[in-house]
Design a protein with these regions (language model features):
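Active-site helix of classical SDR
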Residues: 154, 188, 196
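The beta1-alpha1 cofactor-binding region of Rossmann-like NAD(H)/NADP(H)-dependent oxidoreductases
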Residues: 71, 92-105, 136, 248-249
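Short C-terminal tail/terminal secondary-structure segment
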Residues: 4, 17, 25-26, 128, ...
Length: 281
């Protein structure tokens, strides 16, 4: 089933959603796949990022999360990570600022003692009715958050990463097929996929794996905070499974791609978690 119609102000908050997303990995049991690894998750305050941060902690990793200003959501993520007896570093700020992209890496290394795993997950979207409605400011902001921050954070992180480390990027089904009302967003997600392929080739000689998860509809604060209420109603019903994914259902894909015991020969791949929808190619 889809979700009931609702809307809230940007950037969106978990507690204001009905129903709240399942993003605490309550039923997930770790197996030490990421024992003593140190991870940075952008957009880690809620949604997919929260579920990934908690799953990594359950697998034995310490985690830093970067987010804009959703402090209450971020503190809840920290509680969940620390409940697993792992460290959590909170890094608020605007990843659209190139200097802050470097700072979150520096603060992660300072707080955790190093950096082994990077999850580029932060995202911004603003639907439009017509292509002409996309202003230069919106176009540039969407690329700045969704694509430029990925590269800037990764560029800074590479100074601290080496053999056996991993990068996992979050794209979208819209990067595979496009979306008439999310033109700029879809363009960034397609760019992330191509960038993943290229970075995987470039970093393979260093022993750093780079992969991507491209989800279909997912129930996160991004949806009611950016989409009109009438489009939120029934969100996700179009896929064969007739519902959106919960963040908890996607986080294990990130664990798989981050864990050398599970995916040491996998790099330059995209996991498309689409609820039964198929893409050409």
């Amino acid at each position: 089933m889809g979700k009931p119609g609702q809307q809230q102000e940007r950037p969106g908050y978990t507690k204001e959603m009905t129903p709240e997303p399942k993003d605490s990995m309550k039923d997930y049991e770790g197996r030490g796949l990421l024992k003593d690894r140190r991870a940075l998750v952008t957009g880690g305050d809620s949604g997919i990022g929260r579920a990934v941060a908690v799953a990594f902690a359950k697998e034995g990793a310490d985690v830093a999360i970067a987010y804009l200003d959703e402090q209450e959501d971020a503190e809840r993520t920290a509680e969940l990570v620390e409940a697993e007896r792992r460290q959590c570093v909170l890094l608020p700020g605007d990843l659209g600022d190139r200097d802050h992209c470097r700072e979150v890496v520096d603060q992660t290394v300072k707080g955790l003692g190093g950096l082994d795993l990077l999850v580029n997950n932060i995202a911004y979207q603003n639907p439009v009715e017509r292509p002409e409605d996309i202003t230069d400011e919106q176009w540039e902001h969407t690329f700045n958050i969704n694509m430029h921050s990925f590269h800037r954070v990764t560029r800074a992180a590479l100074a601290h990463m080496g053999e056996g480390d991993a990068i996992v990027n979050c794209a979208s089904v819209n990067g595979l097929r496009g979306n008439k009302s999310l033109i700029d967003y879809s363009a960034t997600k397609g760019a992330i996929i191509a960038w993943t392929y290229s970075m995987a080739q470039a970093l393979a000689p260093r022993g750093i794996r780079v992969n991507c998860v491209a989800p279909g509809p997912v129930w996160t604060p991004l949806i009611p905070s950016t989409m009109p209420e009438e489009k939120v109603e029934g969100f996700g019903e179009q896929v064969p499974m007739s519902r959106p994914a919960e963040p908890d259902e996607l986080a294990p894909s990130f664990v798989f791609l981050a864990a050398n015991r599970m995916s040491s020969y996998i790099t330059g791949e995209v996991i498309a978690a689409l609820g039964g929808e198929t893409m050409p190619g």
